[in-house]
Amino acid sequence: MSPFQNFMILEEKQLLILMKTNSEICKELVSNPEKFNKLEQFVSLVEEWNKKINLTGFEGENLWKEGINESFFCFEKILETKNLNDFENKSWVDIGSGAGFPIIPFAIIYPKINFYIIESNSKRVRFLELVNEKLNLKIKIFNTRAENFSELKFDFVSARAVAHLDLLIKYFMKITKQDATGYFIKGPKIFEEKEEINNKKISIETLKIDKIKEKNVFVVKMNRI
Protein backbone atom coordinates (compact mmCIF):
# COMPACT_ATOMS: atom_id res chain seq x y z
CA MET A 1 0.00 0.00 0.00
CA SER A 2 1.38 3.40 -0.99
CA PRO A 3 1.94 6.24 1.51
CA PHE A 4 -0.77 8.14 -0.34
CA GLN A 5 -3.27 5.32 0.28
CA ASN A 6 -2.26 5.26 3.95
CA PHE A 7 -2.86 8.99 4.15
CA MET A 8 -6.29 8.60 2.53
CA ILE A 9 -7.29 5.92 5.07
CA LEU A 10 -6.12 8.16 7.93
CA GLU A 11 -8.07 11.09 6.51
CA GLU A 12 -11.17 8.92 6.20
CA LYS A 13 -10.90 7.78 9.84
CA GLN A 14 -10.47 11.37 11.03
CA LEU A 15 -13.49 12.42 8.96
CA LEU A 16 -15.60 9.63 10.47
CA ILE A 17 -14.63 10.81 13.96
CA LEU A 18 -15.57 14.39 13.09
CA MET A 19 -18.90 13.20 11.65
CA LYS A 20 -19.92 11.47 14.89
CA THR A 21 -22.58 13.22 16.90
CA ASN A 22 -21.87 14.08 20.53
CA SER A 23 -24.42 11.47 21.63
CA GLU A 24 -22.52 8.84 19.61
CA ILE A 25 -19.26 9.93 21.24
CA CYS A 26 -20.97 9.62 24.64
CA LYS A 27 -22.24 6.14 23.78
CA GLU A 28 -18.66 5.05 23.13
CA LEU A 29 -17.48 6.66 26.37
CA VAL A 30 -20.15 4.95 28.46
CA SER A 31 -20.24 1.53 26.70
CA ASN A 32 -22.93 0.27 29.13
CA PRO A 33 -26.29 0.26 27.22
CA GLU A 34 -28.45 0.57 30.34
CA LYS A 35 -26.51 3.59 31.61
CA PHE A 36 -26.52 5.22 28.18
CA ASN A 37 -30.30 4.71 28.03
CA LYS A 38 -30.61 6.61 31.31
CA LEU A 39 -28.51 9.43 29.87
CA GLU A 40 -30.84 9.60 26.88
CA GLN A 41 -33.84 9.77 29.22
CA PHE A 42 -32.14 12.53 31.20
CA VAL A 43 -31.46 14.57 28.06
CA SER A 44 -35.10 14.17 26.99
CA LEU A 45 -36.30 15.39 30.39
CA VAL A 46 -33.97 18.41 30.26
CA GLU A 47 -35.28 19.34 26.80
CA GLU A 48 -38.90 18.88 27.91
CA TRP A 49 -38.53 20.95 31.09
CA ASN A 50 -36.42 23.59 29.38
CA LYS A 51 -39.61 24.62 27.57
CA LYS A 52 -41.33 25.21 30.93
CA ILE A 53 -38.61 26.74 33.10
CA ASN A 54 -35.15 28.19 32.53
CA LEU A 55 -33.04 25.11 33.25
CA THR A 56 -30.04 25.57 30.95
CA GLY A 57 -28.86 27.26 27.77
CA PHE A 58 -27.73 23.88 26.41
CA GLU A 59 -29.93 22.27 23.76
CA GLY A 60 -29.70 19.64 21.03
CA GLU A 61 -26.20 18.36 20.33
CA ASN A 62 -24.78 21.04 22.61
CA LEU A 63 -26.66 19.46 25.50
CA TRP A 64 -24.69 16.27 24.92
CA LYS A 65 -21.43 18.10 24.25
CA GLU A 66 -21.31 20.71 27.03
CA GLY A 67 -23.64 19.00 29.48
CA ILE A 68 -23.00 15.26 29.36
CA ASN A 69 -19.60 14.76 27.71
CA GLU A 70 -17.91 17.66 29.52
CA SER A 71 -19.14 16.19 32.81
CA PHE A 72 -17.43 12.91 31.97
CA PHE A 73 -14.21 14.63 30.90
CA CYS A 74 -14.18 16.45 34.23
CA PHE A 75 -14.63 13.19 36.13
CA GLU A 76 -11.78 11.63 34.14
CA LYS A 77 -9.58 14.48 35.36
CA ILE A 78 -10.82 13.97 38.93
CA LEU A 79 -9.84 10.29 38.68
CA GLU A 80 -6.26 11.40 38.04
CA THR A 81 -6.22 12.60 41.67
CA LYS A 82 -7.85 9.55 43.32
CA ASN A 83 -8.84 5.98 42.50
CA LEU A 84 -12.50 5.25 41.84
CA ASN A 85 -12.51 3.00 44.93
CA ASP A 86 -11.75 6.07 47.06
CA PHE A 87 -15.20 7.45 46.20
CA GLU A 88 -17.28 4.32 46.73
CA ASN A 89 -19.74 4.49 49.63
CA LYS A 90 -18.57 8.04 50.39
CA SER A 91 -20.80 11.13 50.43
CA TRP A 92 -20.59 13.60 47.54
CA VAL A 93 -22.66 16.78 47.43
CA ASP A 94 -23.16 19.05 44.42
CA ILE A 95 -24.02 22.70 45.10
CA GLY A 96 -26.40 24.63 42.83
CA SER A 97 -27.00 21.70 40.49
CA GLY A 98 -29.53 23.53 38.30
CA ALA A 99 -30.26 21.24 35.33
CA GLY A 100 -28.15 18.50 36.91
CA PHE A 101 -24.65 18.98 35.49
CA PRO A 102 -22.33 17.38 36.41
CA ILE A 103 -24.08 15.48 39.20
CA ILE A 104 -26.73 13.54 37.25
CA PRO A 105 -24.26 12.08 34.70
CA PHE A 106 -21.93 11.22 37.61
CA ALA A 107 -24.75 9.47 39.50
CA ILE A 108 -25.82 7.49 36.43
CA ILE A 109 -22.33 6.18 35.73
CA TYR A 110 -21.10 5.75 39.34
CA PRO A 111 -24.05 4.43 41.41
CA LYS A 112 -21.82 3.25 44.29
CA ILE A 113 -21.16 6.86 45.35
CA ASN A 114 -23.70 8.40 47.74
CA PHE A 115 -24.68 11.59 45.92
CA TYR A 116 -26.48 14.61 47.38
CA ILE A 117 -27.71 17.88 45.89
CA ILE A 118 -28.09 21.32 47.47
CA GLU A 119 -30.27 23.52 45.23
CA SER A 120 -32.09 26.68 46.31
CA ASN A 121 -34.40 27.08 43.29
CA SER A 122 -37.68 25.24 44.00
CA LYS A 123 -38.61 24.76 40.32
CA ARG A 124 -35.23 23.19 39.57
CA VAL A 125 -35.58 21.02 42.67
CA ARG A 126 -38.88 19.66 41.31
CA PHE A 127 -37.13 18.84 38.04
CA LEU A 128 -34.22 17.14 39.81
CA GLU A 129 -36.61 15.13 41.99
CA LEU A 130 -38.41 13.94 38.86
CA VAL A 131 -35.12 12.88 37.24
CA ASN A 132 -34.10 11.16 40.45
CA GLU A 133 -37.36 9.19 40.54
CA LYS A 134 -37.57 8.36 36.81
CA LEU A 135 -33.97 7.13 36.62
CA ASN A 136 -33.93 5.49 40.07
CA LEU A 137 -30.77 7.34 41.09
CA LYS A 138 -31.30 7.52 44.88
CA ILE A 139 -29.84 11.03 45.19
CA LYS A 140 -30.79 12.93 48.36
CA ILE A 141 -31.92 16.45 47.39
CA PHE A 142 -32.05 19.45 49.74
CA ASN A 143 -34.03 22.54 48.73
CA THR A 144 -31.92 25.16 50.48
CA ARG A 145 -28.86 27.37 50.12
CA ALA A 146 -25.39 26.04 50.89
CA GLU A 147 -24.75 28.80 53.44
CA ASN A 148 -27.86 27.70 55.37
CA PHE A 149 -27.14 23.97 55.26
CA SER A 150 -26.11 22.25 58.49
CA GLU A 151 -27.57 18.72 58.39
CA LEU A 152 -24.51 16.76 57.21
CA LYS A 153 -20.78 16.95 56.59
CA PHE A 154 -19.62 15.50 53.27
CA ASP A 155 -16.53 13.68 51.98
CA PHE A 156 -16.58 15.40 48.57
CA VAL A 157 -18.20 18.52 47.16
CA SER A 158 -18.58 19.84 43.62
CA ALA A 159 -20.12 22.81 41.81
CA ARG A 160 -20.14 23.97 38.22
CA ALA A 161 -19.97 27.70 37.46
CA VAL A 162 -21.88 28.54 40.65
CA ALA A 163 -19.92 31.21 42.50
CA HIS A 164 -16.64 33.07 42.98
CA LEU A 165 -13.83 30.95 44.41
CA ASP A 166 -13.92 32.88 47.69
CA LEU A 167 -17.55 31.87 48.24
CA LEU A 168 -16.85 28.27 47.22
CA ILE A 169 -14.17 28.11 49.92
CA LYS A 170 -16.75 29.23 52.51
CA TYR A 171 -19.16 26.54 51.34
CA PHE A 172 -16.38 23.96 51.40
CA MET A 173 -15.36 24.82 54.96
CA LYS A 174 -18.98 24.79 56.18
CA ILE A 175 -20.38 21.54 54.76
CA THR A 176 -17.44 19.12 54.47
CA LYS A 177 -15.49 16.81 56.76
CA GLN A 178 -11.96 17.64 57.87
CA ASP A 179 -10.31 15.38 55.26
CA ALA A 180 -12.74 16.27 52.45
CA THR A 181 -11.89 17.23 48.88
CA GLY A 182 -13.65 19.80 46.70
CA TYR A 183 -13.86 19.65 42.90
CA PHE A 184 -15.14 22.88 41.37
CA ILE A 185 -15.57 23.29 37.61
CA LYS A 186 -14.51 26.76 36.51
CA GLY A 187 -13.56 28.77 33.43
CA PRO A 188 -10.39 30.82 32.77
CA LYS A 189 -11.35 33.50 35.33
CA ILE A 190 -10.24 31.05 38.01
CA PHE A 191 -6.71 32.48 37.87
CA GLU A 192 -7.95 36.01 38.62
CA GLU A 193 -10.05 34.63 41.46
CA LYS A 194 -7.09 32.73 42.91
CA GLU A 195 -5.08 35.96 43.01
CA GLU A 196 -7.73 37.46 45.29
CA ILE A 197 -7.63 34.56 47.77
CA ASN A 198 -5.61 34.82 50.96
CA ASN A 199 -6.62 31.72 52.90
CA LYS A 200 -3.77 29.75 54.46
CA LYS A 201 -6.10 26.97 55.63
CA ILE A 202 -6.82 25.79 52.08
CA SER A 203 -4.71 24.27 49.30
CA ILE A 204 -5.91 24.84 45.74
CA GLU A 205 -4.78 22.97 42.61
CA THR A 206 -6.01 23.92 39.13
CA LEU A 207 -6.36 21.02 36.68
CA LYS A 208 -7.00 21.75 32.98
CA ILE A 209 -9.43 19.51 31.09
CA ASP A 210 -7.33 18.75 28.00
CA LYS A 211 -10.09 16.88 26.16
CA ILE A 212 -12.20 20.05 25.95
CA LYS A 213 -10.55 21.86 23.03
CA GLU A 214 -12.92 24.73 22.19
CA LYS A 215 -12.57 26.54 25.52
CA ASN A 216 -10.57 26.49 28.74
CA VAL A 217 -12.26 24.43 31.46
CA PHE A 218 -10.62 23.59 34.78
CA VAL A 219 -11.30 21.40 37.78
CA VAL A 220 -10.25 23.27 40.93
CA LYS A 221 -9.18 20.71 43.54
CA MET A 222 -9.50 21.98 47.12
CA ASN A 223 -8.31 20.52 50.44
CA ARG A 224 -7.78 21.73 53.98
CA ILE A 225 -4.15 22.13 55.04
Swiss-Prot record:
Pfam family, one: GidB
Binding residues annotated for S-adenosyl-L-methionine, in chain numbering: G96, F101, A146, E147, R160
InterPro entries attached to this UniProt entry: rRNA_ssu_MeTfrase_G, SAM-dependent_MTases_sf
Cell division among keywords: no
Gene Ontology molecular function: rRNA (guanine-N7-)-methyltransferase activity
Keyword Cell inner membrane: no
EC number: 2.1.1.-
Localization per Swiss-Prot or TrEMBL: Cytoplasm
Enzyme type, top EC level: transferase
GO CC, alphabetical: cytosol
UniProt keyword list: Cytoplasm, Methyltransferase, rRNA processing, S-adenosyl-L-methionine, Transferase
PANTHER family reported in the protein's UniProt record: S-ADENOSYL-L-METHIONINE-DEPENDENT METHYLTRANSFERASES SUPERFAMILY PROTEIN (PTHR31760:SF0)
HAMAP family attached to this UniProt entry: 16SrRNA_methyltr_G
Protein family according to the UniProt entry: Belongs to the methyltransferase superfamily. RNA methyltransferase RsmG family.
Role according to the record: Specifically methylates the N7 position of a guanine in 16S rRNA.
Protein name: Ribosomal RNA small subunit methyltransferase G
Organism: Mycoplasma mobile (strain ATCC 43663 / 163K / NCTC 11711)
Gene name of the record: rsmG
